[in-house]
């Protein structure tokens, strides 16, 4: 082995003894993921005495391919899982996939169509076998992609919603709810997809605003020369009209209530009824009523005992109830009906109208309200407890703003249509008796009718809504309905990380089912993350061409850079605006850490970290500062993760790593590391080792691969087989010096001030200069005395004078750093006249840029035609040029003051 190690992994540690010059993510990621899995580091021990932390993955569809939503969701979950594992918890991250009924059936049906076949050719059993075959061959793609993301799920426990154990749980829940009268069968209006030939819940219907028409139709009143005008966006449904409604207080139609309309094209009389649903101020104040094809009309139809006439078949084709329009597809029927009404002089007006059209969430076919016999869950009693659980804090929803959305839906919840007319899914465990027509619902397949004892039974052909089995996910995956050790240890789960788009589909239903069947909430926290959009805040879509593929990004920039980017932009309640440039920026961060680690390792070759006790060391001011800052960063990172503020954790770690550790401490340590004082060098090595080793632990949940690679390359024995098994932080054992840290930061402010002046005045960076520090207090002078060596070294100063009321040099550029004024004598350093000429020349150039971009961005034609990305880039260029111009002018003013 390249390292000695206190633990004995199954294989040699898969790494070189030293870090190569460049970081190659692909090779590093593959070897460490294999190492973690082969050594069982993701596995949750249900018999462990450690406190549990459990989280269930929102199971991706078995048809799925990793997209940005998956990437964000699973990165955040993995950060939590790795952090809690390192923080001493027994972590179960439960993985699995969803059978995705309609989606998977569509995929396999397309395959069959390409082969010139169909599911009907195979028959139900043959088709289901074919889907299982597809799942075996292709269904694991999304899981392999999650592994590339670094997901530390317990893959030994991977579940599938059609697994035998989960299927048993589904049947138990269905039968129990049926026995309690909460599941029932009813003939009512549902959302119907004419393409998928199945019912859809309200949540499975996506509404899109579409430009269409509002047609005003004339309906003759029987026995008079009057007519009523009704407006509709779906004129074909008039074939099923069974009434015209007016408001009971509408005086215009008071004398017509109770009379009849002669329904055009159908020669059928329908009544004029009064109902308060009608808005008498909208349109003519008269509304056509089609109870079998409109949800509002359905309720009116029930109130007035109207006839329900279904005019379509399951494919959206007009049936025998449509008279002469029988056999026409619904939109063909619309065209024909409008033409015939127009010919009869009954089409009064056509106006443009923006309409919210409901579409199937899977195939995007326009849905049809359709009368059908379906299975339902009465969710009202279940919802009451789920509402109470959030109200009383048993479950927290984070950010809290989503609680309002949750309550609004739950307080207005409607019964859940759970039956689907497809073949792939959990078949409803109900059997119909040929003898008595009664239904038998059973945990086991029955051999006889539970009502009359007859043996000729036919099982329900419908399957359950995919979300029915998903609603049981937190406890069915742990072995329910059996009382398992896993359930005892890990239920209720600690948190759920999910997108807001499935708050109702999934989260609310898990709440209801968990409380019903486990007597406890399924999770203590629900963290709802935002959407990943493009750099301009636009939703990613193939049609816009702005989709960023996670796997392409991982291949190009590495998983760690990608993960850190997602975390850095995952602010609560704010969508992630993602661009490839930002990911490239965080790749630079990974490289910065890599290069700093290479520097450290080169200076730790002769160092043995065993027995480090920094309390016994004579620490410099810089060392006390970096250790104190490390203690604070560890606390801030842990607090941010505890509060699901992933962006704050990333920000704290980024700033400390890049600026404080790499830019400052490494530079501050070089004199000691390169010096002749052996004791001083040993202490400097001990601090460098400690800070880097602890920093890698803090970074690991966000950047698991590069941190493992570097951590394993550190000298000495490792305290664990992997960094992911090490403690998240042991900084509580480190010495801290608050006053010393404060003094060091004042010294650093002075160094930054000197550097700023050098930059503004164009003093060559390598040129050693003189400086004067006018201290306003004796305490400030004491601090400067303590930091004299640092200031001279890092600010490249040969002659440094400081004190209270110190003599001020002539022709000096100045800057204030707190209670210290920095003065840099410029005489002999630069030619003031030449510098003034240079600045004027640069100002003229930048002013041209500002003028050019200003004109461009005030051009209405350009603004109207240019893509959003181009506009954004030009606006940024203008802002950068204006900022540069301001800095140059300030520099010129300072020069003028010196002359």
UniProtKB/Swiss-Prot annotation:
InterPro entries found in the cross-reference section: aa-tRNA-synth_I_CS, aa-tRNA-synth_Ia, Anticodon_Ia_Val, M/V/L/I-tRNA-synth_anticd-bd, Rossmann-like_a/b/a_fold, tRNA-bd_arm, tRNAsynth_Ia_anticodon-bd, Val-tRNA_synth_C_sf
Residues the record lists as binding ATP: 542
A Gene Ontology BP annotation from the UniProt entry: valyl-tRNA aminoacylation
This enzyme's EC code(s): 6.1.1.9
Location in the cell: Cytoplasm
Gene Ontology molecular function: aminoacyl-tRNA deacylase activity; ATP binding; valine-tRNA ligase activity
Superkingdom assignment: Bacteria
Cited PROSITE patterns: AA_TRNA_LIGASE_I
Residue positions of motif 'HIGH' region: 60-70
Pfam families documented for this protein: Anticodon_1, tRNA-synt_1, Val_tRNA-synt_C
Annotated GO CC locations: cytosol
Keywords, alphabetical: Aminoacyl-tRNA synthetase, ATP-binding, Coiled coil, Cytoplasm, Ligase, Nucleotide-binding, Protein biosynthesis
Similarity-based family: Belongs to the class-I aminoacyl-tRNA synthetase family. ValS type 1 subfamily.
Record's comment describing the protein's domains: ValRS has two distinct active sites: one for aminoacylation and one for editing. The misactivated threonine is translocated from the active site to the editing site.
Task of the protein: Catalyzes the attachment of valine to tRNA(Val). As ValRS can inadvertently accommodate and process structurally similar amino acids such as threonine, to avoid such errors, it has a 'posttransfer' editing activity that hydrolyzes mischarged Thr-tRNA(Val) in a tRNA-dependent manner.
Protein's name according to its UniProt entry: Valine--tRNA ligase
Gene name per UniProt: valS
